[in-house]
From Swiss-Prot:
<feature type="binding site">
    <location>
        <begin position="274"/>
        <end position="275"/>
    </location>
    <ligand>
        <name>carbamoyl phosphate</name>
    </ligand>
</feature>
<feature type="binding site">
    <location>
        <position position="319"/>
    </location>
    <ligand>
        <name>carbamoyl phosphate</name>
    </ligand>
</feature>
<feature type="binding site">
    <location>
        <begin position="57"/>
        <end position="60"/>
    </location>
    <ligand>
        <name>carbamoyl phosphate</name>
    </ligand>
</feature>
<dbReference type="GO" id="GO:0006526">
    <property type="term" value="P:L-arginine biosynthetic process"/>
</dbReference>
<comment type="pathway">
    <text>Amino-acid degradation; L-arginine degradation via ADI pathway; carbamoyl phosphate from L-arginine: step 2/2.</text>
</comment>
<feature type="binding site">
    <location>
        <begin position="235"/>
        <end position="236"/>
    </location>
    <ligand>
        <name>L-ornithine</name>
    </ligand>
</feature>
<keyword id="KW-0056">Arginine metabolism</keyword>
<dbReference type="InterPro" id="IPR006132">
    <property type="entry name" value="Asp/Orn_carbamoyltranf_P-bd"/>
</dbReference>
<keyword id="KW-0808">Transferase</keyword>
<dbReference type="GO" id="GO:0019240">
    <property type="term" value="P:citrulline biosynthetic process"/>
</dbReference>
<keyword id="KW-0963">Cytoplasm</keyword>
<dbReference type="GO" id="GO:0042450">
    <property type="term" value="P:arginine biosynthetic process via ornithine"/>
</dbReference>
<feature type="binding site">
    <location>
        <position position="167"/>
    </location>
    <ligand>
        <name>L-ornithine</name>
    </ligand>
</feature>
<dbReference type="GO" id="GO:0004585">
    <property type="term" value="F:ornithine carbamoyltransferase activity"/>
</dbReference>
<dbReference type="InterPro" id="IPR036901">
    <property type="entry name" value="Asp/Orn_carbamoylTrfase_sf"/>
</dbReference>
<comment type="function">
    <text>Reversibly catalyzes the transfer of the carbamoyl group from carbamoyl phosphate (CP) to the N(epsilon) atom of ornithine (ORN) to produce L-citrulline.</text>
</comment>
<comment type="similarity">
    <text>Belongs to the aspartate/ornithine carbamoyltransferase superfamily. OTCase family.</text>
</comment>
Length: 339
């Protein structure tokens, strides 16, 4: 009997149904329990996994590496200096070669087209560890964290504040719409998500009943939120836009005043961040921003980051469990005839 997931790639959330995404979230929670209990789950024994990184990473690389090892697979890291995608060798040729040697491929880089071509030509499952457009592996971890905290996904209100046209905003909007989560993007008009992404989300919301909102009004956007979510103000490759972004996004910083505007501080409220976070001056970027712009915190204050509302480290750990679920489901020959 065919498995729902076997042999499939995870390139963008919109390629998966609500039931499939819910299954991956629940399977992630199950594998986390096995890990905590010390129960082996070597579903990928003898498999070899290529980890392709055009963009640097702490969490994604660590999560894929430990997840692969826990599953009994051997991960092989190939950094930007090790791969020639489109430079000295076409993506197609690279994909064919890697597909003949590895059983699965993770890609973290810039172009969505590259990860799609890897999947098209390699003949093995390919997992998108982040592109400029989508971040699907992060989504399974994020909604896993939401479900662990609230016991459900449907009807939860998640508000993303910050740069509304980056990959995190895209993925949260579309994935939430698929899962029946009410998603609001609260951002300056200049940084609203693209019409293409909004239209994807609207179509999914019609089916799931999710309520969507795109607004530049902070008070309106965050009122009644269960989850406040933010990300760095400047994405990788956009470092020249620091000044522009700092000036645009200052009003969208997650701070205690914003939490009060949710009118839910005494209820069910958590704060998520995919990390790294610029919540103090203990980084080179933090020092530079403090020196140039006179602010010691960017997208989230240190007070909120370290408060009882912060779930960012729980969320980061869940990257490993969710990536494990994704790889096991798509490569592990598991009996999943339906979801």
């Amino acid at each position: 009997m065919n498995s729902v997931f076997q042999g499939r790639s995870l390139l963008a959330e919109k390629d998966f149904s609500r039931a499939e995404l819910e299954y991956l979230v629940d399977f992630s929670i199950h594998l986390k329990e096995l890990k905590k209990k010390g129960i082996p789950h070597h579903y990928l024994e003898g498999k070899n996994i290529a980890l392709l990184f055009e963009k640097t990473s702490t969490r994604t690389r660590s999560a894929f590496t430990t997840a692969a090892i826990d599953l009994g697979a051997h991960p092989e890291y190939l950094g930007a200096n090790d791969i020639q995608l489109g430079k000295k060798e076409s993506v197609e040729d690279t994909a064919i070669v890697l597909g003949s040697m590895f059983d699965g491929i993770e890609f973290r880089g810039f172009s969505q087209e590259v990860v799609e071509d890897l999947a098209k030509y390699s003949g093995v499952p390919v997992w998108n560890g982040l592109t400029d457009q989508w971040h699907p592996t992060q989504m399974i971890a994020d909604f896993m964290t939401v479900k662990e905290n609230f016991g459900r996904l449907e009807g939860i209100t998640l508000v993303y504040v910050g740069d509304g046209r980056n990959n995190m905003a895209n993925s949260l909007l579309v994935t939430g719409a698929i899962l029946g989560v009410n998603v609001r993007i609260c951002a300056p008009k200049e940084l609203f998500p693209s019409d293409e992404v909004v239209n994807y989300a609207k179509e999914f919301a019609k089916e799931s009943g999710a309520e969507l909102m795109i607004t530049d009004d902070v008070a309106k956007g965050v009122k009644g939120a269960n989850v406040l979510y933010t990300d760095v103000w400047v994405s990788m490759g956009e470092e020249d836009k620091f000044e522009e972004r700092v000036n645009l996004l200052k009003p969208y910083q997650i701070n205690m005043a914003m939490l009060e505007k949710t009118e839910n501080m005494d209820g069910d409220l958590i704060v998520l961040h995919c990390l790294p976070a610029f919540h103090d001056t203990k980084t080179q970027y933090g020092e530079m921003v403090a020196e140039k712009f006179g602010i010691t915190e960017m997208e989230i204050t240190d007070e909120v980051f370290r408060s009882k509302y912060g779930r960012q480290f729980e969320e980061a750990e869940n990257r490993m469990h969710s990536i494990k679920a994704i790889m096991a489901a798509t490569l592990g020959n598991l009996f999943i005839p339906r979801v």
